[in-house]
Amino acid sequence: MIQILITGLFLLAQPSEPQDSLTVTQQGRTIATVNREDFTMPLPGTPMVDYEKYSKFIKQLDQKVYREPINAVLNDHGSIVPGRVGYKLYQQAFMEKFYAYFYGQGPSKIEVPEMNIYPKVDSELLAHISTQQLGQYVTYFNSSNKSRSHNISLSAKAIDNHVVFPNETFSFNQVVGMRTRNKGYKSAPIIVKGELSEGVGGGICQVSSTLFNAVDRAGLQIVQRYSHTRSVPYVPPGRDATVSWGGPDFRFQNQYNQPILIRAKRYGGSMIITLYSSDVINSRLRKIPKAPSRIPKEINAEQ
């Protein structure tokens, strides 16, 4: 009798599943628990799935399951860092499992079926398109202006390792995104030759202008480019590309039959952008003037 009582108390202490529960797991980890009644339409007769509630559940589940793919990149030493396959909820396969549970009996458990999402740029492609240098351009700036230098580094990082596929159009504003304080950009107003220049995100146009000249050197098709209303000190006259979120953009198209890899890096007071592709690319390079190595004196307007 005592043994039976102890056994009963032991069973009561164990966690039990609700009679109609569905436990959804991902890689063995529980991510959702629901019941049949949560999705049953209030109609007499044979139970039916409330599709509106099911769709809402699937949307929430997909957000939990989703893992973004990561492209392969080149590190600062030129070595390939492999990418990562992402995945999302395989909705058709999950629906079949869910309906089997819904019209069945008792509790059930579903390990979410995942659908792989492969990165656009894998190690093999990156190795293929990083062999032939198409165009390079170097501009210079005053590295003692910390805020402006920071903005240059930040925007250069945004376009570094970006791959432009054949017939694809690159948009500077779209790739770099909005330049805000929340994203780390700083106010960098300076005075050059007595005129106030730049504000939050100051320095971005030097990156876009450096990119324009590298792109032009590589013989790529310029789709959209605007010059500043006045000359800028870091490129020859007429060789700049002003950009502004919600305003002017710099865009170019890859008309070649091979992808183009952008490498962008700030080294001290130099901004260097180099374009690479496959060694089988049939490119037509252009001659362009070099940037001035001496820049005019500037005054930090915040001081």
Curated annotation (Swiss-Prot):
<dbReference type="InterPro" id="IPR052913">
    <property type="entry name" value="Glycopeptide_resist_protein"/>
</dbReference>
<protein>
    <recommendedName>
        <fullName>Uncharacterized protein YoaR</fullName>
    </recommendedName>
</protein>
<dbReference type="Pfam" id="PF12229">
    <property type="entry name" value="PG_binding_4"/>
</dbReference>
<dbReference type="Pfam" id="PF04294">
    <property type="entry name" value="VanW"/>
</dbReference>
<dbReference type="InterPro" id="IPR022029">
    <property type="entry name" value="YoaR-like_PG-bd"/>
</dbReference>
<dbReference type="InterPro" id="IPR007391">
    <property type="entry name" value="Vancomycin_resist_VanW"/>
</dbReference>
